[in-house]
Amino acid sequence: LERVLPVIGCYADTIVETGPLGSAHTIKLLNNFLALATGAVVGEALAAAMSLGVDLSVFDAAVRTGGADSAMYRRFAHWALEGDDSHFQATMRIGEKDLRYYRQMADAAELPTAMADAATQLYRLASQLGHARQFMPVLPSILASLADGRERALPRRE
């Protein structure tokens, strides 16, 4: 590991020794699941706030002072508040793929996947509605439009 650290450091922001061969992949899948499931919850909450007419800046102030604040919330909030989806440049299609890999690992170990299944449904729905290439932070706008019928502008990425 010591010999390759300088090379890995050229393209990795964080390097964590995870243990035996294969453990890094397992941890990556777990981390991606946690981030994507959180993103799905954040997306649904922001969509509800949009559809209910909540002042998003007030909602944001409340979230940032409580336990719901997270890196994923902040990445999605940039879109909801400023129309900037660049803070998490992963597409709905990538979300589906990463959750599928997590579910395969969990299924093989006979672990529950209820949250992974629910998150997968939201990213798959966005993809099926024609937004597979959209970055994940626009999920709230897609879900809000579906719920209330009001069209919301999305980045031109299709």
PLM region descriptions:
Residues 5-18, 93-99, 153-158:
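A charged, well-structured terminal subsegment
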Residues 1-36:
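Rossmann-fold dinucleotide-binding core
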Residues 23-146:
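Helical "substrate-binding/catalytic lid" subdomain
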Residues 141-158:
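Terminal low-complexity tails and localization/encapsulation signals of metabolic enzymes
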